[in-house]
């Protein structure tokens, strides 16, 4: 099975955050003010990770682990949410996928790093069983750093699972 580079399976997506993405909001000067619900952010991050995993493996994938979901800053209604996602590391049947979320204030243009997480997806064959994935080929220094860090995280996950 031929490997794939990080850029071959990475994705970037944008979403306008609307009132229905918020748990609560109010109007100030006829503008909706409120924060996007964390569950909506997590859903969008899981969805893009699934797309990256499918793009990399050529298979449907199942989420096995969502690790280290961190919320650094809120995303507000009216912001553009930007998701950047790529495969950091591959095992035999699984892939660690890194996701970075940013919020862009469309009025000021200011971009804020809001969330990050790692997700492990498992490729699934036509019978619902885990199947092999192409190995990731890190090219850039950043790709290589992410690969090295992801390998350490993967080894820790394996240790925890086997203890």
Regions picked out by a protein language model, each given a short descriptive name:
Residues 1-163:
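Terminal targeting signals and extreme-terminal segments of soluble enzymes
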